[in-house]
Structure formats: structure tokens, C-alpha cells
Amino acid sequence: MSMNMKKTIVGLLTAAACLLANAGVIHFDDLPGDETLPIAAGYAGFDWTNMGTVRFDAWPGSGFEAGTVSGDNVAYNWYGAPATVASSDGGAFAFTGAYFTSAWVDQEISFEGWRSGQQLFASGAYTLETTAPVWIQLDWAGIDTLLIYNSSPTPWAMDEFTVPEPGSLALVGTSVVGLMAARRRRKA
């Protein structure tokens, strides 16, 4: 294998590692899990409207328990009302996805992605059950607000809220630019 081929392979592997290793996952496990408390504005860089956390064992046999993917807590929407997750500083973010489970009865959940008051994205409806979490992956970039609404006036549970860290995107971009420069130099 030629030296140039080795460099290309190493560069591609580095770019791939940046994408995989640096997803920011919000687990909610560093919060108290007291269902009477809201998630504080600014938590993990977001403002959480109409949302709290609850411990997995607060309601045995519920979707809160079934929907806990990691640790002890899940986030949920108070009283089954629509919830929003907005960037605390007003900047854009990318929402990869999260695990969702219905707390009490099967229901549907939908999403909208907004930026500066303009709707950029809207999802179809996803069915949530009470017995197991469903991974919902949207991969929406450039939003500053995520609106989550559901068909039933009962709560849903959310865990593993995943957003890529800006640093990982910059590393990938740097790797790609480096690969392009190396290929141009080799062709010259």
C-alpha cells in the first residue's frame, strides 16, 4: 500500500471518529428527578419549557420506568402539554434524536424545528407505547427551538437527548479540508 493511500485512509478514519465520538448526549441524570421541579433554564445550554424530570422508580410499571434508557431519570412534558427545547443563547443547534416513551397510554408525538421565528422542519407522527422506548432520529440542523407535541393529554418520557457538539463538526470539517489539500498537492 502506498504512503498516499495510507494517509488518505488515516484521514478518513479520523474524520469518521470525530463524528462518532463527540455526540453530546443529555441524560438528565445529574438533575434531582423531583417531578415537581421544572428543568432549569440554561440546563445543558437549553431552555426547557413545560418540562421536568422524574425518577424511573417513581411510577412502577409506567412509561417513565420503561423509558429510562440510562441512569435514573427521564425528562417529561408536564400535564401532557406541548414542550419546547430552545437554545439558551439563541444560537442554532442540531437535534439528532432521542428516546421517547408514552407515560400512561399509547399516543402519537410530532416535532417542529424553528429558527428565528420561522418554521424550518415538521415531522410526521410517531407512535409511542408505554412498554418500551422508541428512538426518534430527526437530524435537524440550524434550529434554535424544538417544539414537541402529542396527541394525548398525558405525558411522554424522553431520554438520551442527542445533539452534536460544535467542536466535533469543526473537527470533521478540518479533516475534510486537510484531505482535499493533500489530494490536490498529490495531483500537482
Label for each model-derived stretch:
Residues 24-162:
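Surface-exposed, well-ordered secondary-structure segments
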Residues 11-18:
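Bacterial N-terminal signal peptides
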